[in-house]
């Protein structure tokens, strides 16, 4: 027979403080032009979602048009800060970070060091060592290893045009700024765009003072399949870099169920709940409240606002090289 439609479902693992969340990335969604309007995409998407739930996945993600995929439970959420650094920023504010001892090379035998450095992150997608380099080269990006006085200190993943750095992993925050400034200077780039997750507080503090532009965006489109596990792990992670106010709140998510979130002395528990809930939300509203930087307006109750604003948004993020 002939292929009329495709939906690719790609399993991966998100590691948060050593705990694993099972994620399904959706991609290659396509329908043959002669078969549009036959319902094949809807059928395949629903089949994929059914498989995810049956196999106990916690989360799914994809890219695409919002209204197209909200029918299937996906919505833009998560958070990322997008930065633009240009050569004027380097010249007048970061020139002292430019270092002639920093050398950028193509991939070398130090791939093992790069892999070990990547795995030190507390929030990361698990990447198998055997395909780590392929992962870095996804989207037809280039990979450069960074050396200082012949010592490996990190790596950079950048697009072909040298205008977007999707991944910059180095040994410490000071190296991050030096590598950024030197890379832009050496390549005589007019500008470079890059992104940071919200927990990179020291880097954000430095860069917001000098970057030409900084904007807060949704990280990707997500569909939460297990609220209890996702919220528990992400709030536990948030408690590692921010203070969470003690309290208890119960939620009902329509067509999902009820659960209660409790925070005490930085310890987070999320469990099933029975009874009258404090907050009632649709599935889309719930993801926006819990994970979007723009969702806190969905609950406007003086009894709960202090907890809502302390706990949420939880730090959901997806690096570019891990997107499908």
Label every PLM stretch briefly.
Residues 55, 59, 63, 67-74:
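Hydrophobic or amphipathic alpha-helical targeting/insertion segments
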Residues 31, 37-50, 61, 172-184:
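Conserved acetyl-CoA-binding loop-helix of GNAT-fold acetyltransferases
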Residues 2-12, 23-30, 145, 151-160, ...:
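Conserved beta-strand in the GNAT
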Residues 67, 75-94, 182-324:
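Active-site/acyl-donor-binding loops of N-acyltransferases
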Residues 76, 80-188, 197-201, 225-245, ...:
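Amide-forming acyltransferase catalytic core, primarily the GNAT-like/NAT-type
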């Amino acid at each position: 027979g002939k292929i009329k439609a495709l939906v690719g479902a790609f399993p991966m693992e998100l590691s948060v403080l050593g705990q694993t969340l099972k994620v399904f990335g959706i991609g290659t969604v396509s329908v043959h032009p002669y078969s549009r309007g036959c319902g094949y995409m809807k059928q395949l998407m629903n089949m994929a979602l059914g498989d995810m739930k049956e196999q106990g996945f916690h989360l799914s993600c994809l890219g695409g048009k919002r209204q197209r995929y909200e029918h299937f439970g996906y919505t833009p959420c998560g958070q990322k800060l997008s930065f633009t650094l240009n050569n004027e920023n380097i010249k007048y504010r970061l020139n002292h970070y430019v270092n002639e001892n920093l050398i950028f090379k193509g991939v070398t035998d130090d791939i093992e060091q790069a892999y070990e450095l990547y795995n030190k992150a507390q929030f990361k997608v698990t990447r198998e060592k055997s395909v780590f380099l392929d992962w870095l080269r996804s989207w037809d990006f280039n990979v450069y290893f960074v050396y200082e006085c012949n010592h490996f200190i990190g790596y950079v993943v950048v697009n072909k045009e040298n205008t977007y750095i999707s991944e910059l992993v180095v040994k410490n925050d000071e190296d991050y700024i030096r590598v950024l400034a030197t890379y832009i200077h050496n390549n005589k780039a007019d500008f470079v765009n890059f992104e940071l997750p919200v927990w990179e507080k020291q880097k954000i503090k430095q860069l917001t003072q000098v970057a030409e532009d900084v904007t807060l965006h949704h990280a990707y489109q997500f569909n939460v399949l297990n609220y209890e596990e996702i919220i528990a792990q992400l709030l536990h992670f948030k408690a590692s870099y921010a203070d969470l106010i003690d309290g208890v709140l119960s939620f009902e998510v329509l067509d999902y169920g009820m659960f209660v979130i409790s925070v005490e002395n930085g310890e987070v528990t999320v469990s099933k709940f029975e009874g009258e809930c404090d907050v009632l939300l649709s599935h889309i509203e719930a993801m926006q409240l819990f994970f979007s930087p723009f969702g806190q307006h969905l609950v406007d109750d003086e009894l709960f606002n202090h907890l809502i604003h302390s706990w949420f948004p939880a730090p959901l993020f997806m690096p570019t090289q891990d997107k499908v």
